[in-house]
């Protein structure tokens, strides 16, 4: 086909089968990069031109090896787009696009989606309400935050999804115990005021700066409750034009 394009799809979870099938049905060349542990998963191989397997789980992938592999593939294949199929793969896609100069979301923009500190700083600069927060770079800034912002607070990994790895603290002494335990990795976290209450999420499709579609949902149990007490993440759609939806 004249409009045939080459897509590299990345996923460290088994998902996106329908997307891969549809890409192939449109006449495109489809490559998949996934984890070796998913080799036996029921991928739609008839719709994939070739599968490449990376050792380790998500956080164990060697990005230099990934870059070298895709770079070698590009010696004889023009790559038009890199598509990440899972939230945890966003960094991989932005890393490859930046290094290989492929169109799409780069690392700076990608951090607004995956780096909680960058996300909050961006939202604040746009006038969007945030809980009070602080990076963990500077001791003076941390002490000022603890002395001026009411507890409880939460220490959050900047790169983890949802409420994974969050630590809730109630006083300054305990806060510093946790920060000191992080050692040189403390910069990977941020400090934020805990705000109790219901938690919502809004999913949307935006094209050329215009919101084409959006839907709001409410968690049936907050991510913090699930993280601390176990269970399954569940949410329910908010009916259109209700008070919660408009807010």
What are these regions (language model features)?
Residues 72-79, 147-149, 184-185:
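Glycine-rich phosphate-binding loop signature in dinucleotide/nucleotide-binding domains
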Residues 40-44, 61-65, 112-118, 165, ...:
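Short, charged, surface-exposed secondary-structure boundary motifs
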Residues 19-23, 120, 143, 179:
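Short amphipathic alpha-helical segments and helix-helix/interface helices
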Residues 30-31, 130-131, 189:
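Hydrophobic anchor at the start of a short beta-strand
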Residues 1-108, 140:
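ATP-binding N-terminal substructure of ATP-dependent carboxylate-amine bond-forming enzymes
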Residues 98-165, 172:
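A conserved helix-loop-beta module that forms one wall/lid of the active-site cleft
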Residues 123, 146-169, 186-197, 202, ...:
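ATP-grasp fold ATP-binding core
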Residues 173, 193-247:
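ATP-dependent carboxylate/phosphate-activation module, predominantly the ATP-grasp catalytic core
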């Amino acid at each position: 086909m004249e409009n045939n394009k080459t897509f590299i799809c990345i996923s460290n979870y088994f998902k996106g089968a329908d997307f891969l099938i549809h890409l192939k049905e449109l006449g495109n060349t489809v490559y998949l990069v996934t984890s070796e542990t998913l080799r036996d998963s029921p991928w739609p191989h008839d719709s994939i031109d070739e599968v490449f397997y990376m050792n380790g789980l998500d956080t164990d992938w060697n990005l230099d090896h990934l870059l070298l592999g895709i770079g070698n593939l590009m010696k004889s294949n023009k790559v038009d787009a890199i598509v990440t199929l899972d939230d945890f793969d966003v960094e991989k896609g932005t890393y490859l696009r930046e290094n290989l100069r492929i169109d799409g979301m780069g690392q700076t923009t990608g951090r607004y989606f995956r780096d909680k500190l960058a996300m909050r700083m961006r939202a604040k600069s746009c006038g969007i309400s945030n809980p009070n927060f602080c990076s963990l770079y500077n001791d003076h800034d941390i002490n000022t935050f603890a002395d001026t912002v009411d507890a409880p607070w939460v220490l959050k990994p900047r790169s983890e999804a949802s409420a994974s790895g969050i630590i809730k603290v109630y006083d300054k002494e305990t806060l510093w115990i946790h920060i000191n335990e992080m050692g040189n990795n403390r910069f990977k976290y941020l400090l934020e005021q805990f705000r109790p209450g219901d938690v919502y999420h809004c999913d949307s499709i935006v094209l050329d700066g215009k919101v084409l579609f959006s839907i709001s949902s409410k968690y049936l149990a907050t991510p913090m409750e699930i993280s601390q007490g176990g269970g399954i993440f569940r949410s329910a759609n908010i009916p259109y034009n209700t008070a919660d939806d408009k807010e």
